[in-house]
């Protein structure tokens, strides 16, 4: 039995163009846990997840109501919202397949540095697209807006996490044979100030935070489940090539060359690199359907020391 941290991608709950209601997300969560049940049952497993669409929806709901919530509060709300979906879905799969482990949703805080350069240059998009006619009103909320191909989106700081506060509770649960569901949306961003823990407006990259948690837990493996089977070099070009098993120094070279796109594969590769550099045995990047095959070395990208 090994210890593994699995970071679920957005497609574990939603697909592009689908309605974002409870029923759709619950249905996808059921399928997710069916697919990964052999991994969770046979290994010490921690599951993390993103919250990009959901935290944007929460912020939009507050925008419509006229009662604005701080961004760190919205991240906390998304952890409860998504945690309920995933926990209920797991318990249904557990009952159907007579699985032995219980799942626990952990409201998780990630400590960041108030002086992180990310606060001076917000870059992480959240929420819906805004038209040229709507953008001025959005800016009146104090939001930083950025023009993308399909319209304007709000962008927020995405600082580097430096500590996962609930790590000891997560460690205890996984050691006792349970499945902690943690670091939702990268964790609630907080800073330590004068003996207090204070929320700060940001959204932390969930893969980077999951990698940090995996290192803190001394996990053997770290797996990022996304919507593609492998990491590619020269992606989208005639000579694009999937990466299979690759050593740390090789993928660091590709990373330095700028082979991986900002906001999509780049943070995933960086998270995997961080984990292996911090003592992990291997990091995997693949799609949901190939998670088990990747662990056996038969699919996906596997980064080793």
UniProtKB/Swiss-Prot annotation:
InterPro entries the UniProt entry points to: AceGlu_kinase-like_sf (IPR036393), Asp/Glu/Uridylate_kinase (IPR001048), Carb_kinase (IPR003964)
Highest taxon listed in the record's lineage: Archaea
Gene Ontology molecular functions: ATP binding; carbamate kinase activity
Pathway terms, separated by semicolons: Metabolic intermediate metabolism; carbamoyl phosphate degradation; CO(2) and NH(3) from carbamoyl phosphate: step 1/1
GO cellular component, one term: cytosol
UniProt keywords, alphabetically: Arginine metabolism, ATP-binding, Cytoplasm, Kinase, Nucleotide-binding, Transferase
Name of protein: Carbamate kinase
Subcellular location per the Swiss-Prot or TrEMBL entry: Cytoplasm
Source organism of the structure: Thermoplasma volcanium (strain ATCC 51530 / DSM 4299 / JCM 9571 / NBRC 15438 / GSS1)
Catalytic reactions of this protein: hydrogencarbonate + NH4(+) + ATP = carbamoyl phosphate + ADP + H2O + H(+)
Keyword Cell membrane carried by entry: no
Gene Ontology BP, a term: arginine deiminase pathway
Pfam families tied to this protein: AA_kinase
EC number: 2.7.2.2
Gene3D superfamilies documented for this protein: Acetylglutamate kinase-like (3.40.1160.10)
């Amino acid at each position: 039995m090994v210890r593994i941290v699995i970071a679920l991608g957005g497609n574990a709950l939603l697909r592009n163009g689908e309605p974002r209601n409870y029923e759709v997300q619950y249905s996808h969560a059921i399928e997710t846990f069916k697919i990964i049940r052999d991994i969770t049952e046979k290994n010490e497993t921690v599951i993390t997840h993103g919250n990009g669409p959901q935290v944007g929806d929460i912020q939009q709901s507050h925008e419509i109501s006229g009662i604005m919530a701080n961004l760190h509060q919205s991240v906390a709300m998304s952890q409860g919202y998504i945690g309920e979906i995933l926990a209920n879905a797991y318990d249904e799969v557990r009952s159907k397949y007579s699985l032995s482990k219980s799942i626990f949703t952990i409201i998780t805080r990630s400590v960041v540095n108030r002086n992180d350069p990310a606060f001076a240059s917000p870059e992480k998009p959240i929420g819906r697209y805004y038209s040229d006619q709507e953008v001025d009103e959005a800016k009146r909320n104090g939001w930083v807006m950025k023009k993308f191909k399909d319209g304007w989106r709000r962008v927020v700081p995405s600082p580097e996490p430096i500590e996962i506060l609930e790590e000891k509770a997560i460690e205890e649960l996984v050691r006792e044979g349970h499945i902690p569901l943690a670091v939702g949306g990268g964790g609630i961003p907080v800073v330590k100030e004068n003996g207090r823990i204070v929320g700060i407006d940001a959204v932390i990259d969930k893969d980077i935070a999951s990698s940090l948690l995996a290192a803190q837990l001394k996990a053997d493996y770290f797996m990022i489940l996304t919507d593609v089977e492998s990491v590619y070099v020269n992606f989208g070009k005639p000579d694009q090539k999937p990466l299979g098993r690759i050593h740390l120094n090789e993928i660091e070279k590709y990373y330095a060359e700028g082979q991986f796109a900002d906001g999509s594969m780049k943070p995933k590769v960086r998270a995997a690199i961080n984990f292996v550099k911090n003592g992990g045995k291997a990091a995997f990047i693949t799609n949901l359907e190939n998670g088990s095959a990747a662990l056996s070395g038969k699919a996906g990208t596997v980064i080793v020391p």
